[in-house]
Amino acid sequence: MTKIAVLGNGSWGSVLGSMLADNGNDVTLYGNIESVNEEINKTHTNSHYMKDWKLNENAKATGDLEEALNGAELVLFVLPTKAVRIVAKNVRKVLDKTGAKPLLVTATKGIEPGTKKLISEILTEEVYPNDEDKIVAISGPSHAENVAQKDLTAIACASTDEENAKKVQKIFSNDYVRFYTNDDLVGVEVGGAVKNVIAIAAGILVGQGYGDDAKAALMTRGLAEITRLGVNYFGAKPMTFSGLSGIGDLIVTCTSVNSRNWRAGKQIGEGKSLDYVLKNMGQVVEGATTVKAVHELSEEKNIDMPICDAIYRVLYENTDVAEEIKQMMGRDPKPEIRL
């Protein structure tokens, strides 16, 4: 049994926490909405984020970070990208007092705007300076709604330290979620983050009335952009993007109604504004934040990312969706395979 602190008790945090409790671990969920914490502890439900579902009764919740971290051997970050750095700073303060050195695992999929840092880079900076080996990222085709029902899936767990990846693989795996180790930490993170931008584009196509051929073409060219960014900016391995955290996560996020990024894109394709969509979603749309960082990165390194750049313009420069699609299809001819 491993003592685990799950930081973030939204839909994915709650499901992962419950899954880890299913696996026989001692799990404490940390969140800042007291009513959610009380509901989890009293009724083992989280109706604010997950309707008609119960957590494992052994999973506890608290709004006290020190309580959540007390004795934790593994700390799982399942937070919005914008919250990771401030929470990581607070985690460092607690760990400095106790002297504990738990393994840090991130299930957050994003790139921090401004700094353009991956989540593992933020955790390394704020918690374990110069010790990236203690960070593991998990990413793959895994919607909370499906994992909650114990539907089958597979997820990559990546670290620069193979033994730490194997530890996470052993702790997290069960009979409905299979984990595979990977040594390309940044590649796994880039795939998980940037696919959210492509999912917004996929939703926009559906909102505009386009069919399966258009969606398949978009996903394929979107994967090319993700790979290009991962390899040329972050030094990722190209083959990583053919795996669970690349094409696997991209497929499910671009095709499932459970994908909040896809749903947001569909509404934008139907004519809704980004402000309207974000106010009415009730959940974080990570792709809308990540696209800012991706746009900055593509311009900084002159990386060809026409889909991501178009999504940035639609969301933040209010360009016309139909015109962006027209311009995309009228671009100069290019070879299909290039980095």
From Swiss-Prot:
One of its GO terms (biological process) is carbohydrate metabolic process. It comes from the Bacteria. One of its GO terms (cellular component) is cytosol. GO terms for molecular function: glycerol-3-phosphate dehydrogenase [NAD(P)+] activity; NAD binding. NADPH binds at residues 11-12, 109, 144, 260, 284, 286. Belongs to the NAD-dependent glycerol-3-phosphate dehydrogenase family. This is Glycerol-3-phosphate dehydrogenase [NAD(P)+]. It comes from Lactobacillus helveticus (strain DPC 4571). The lineage of its organism: Bacteria, Bacillati, Bacillota, Bacilli, Lactobacillales.
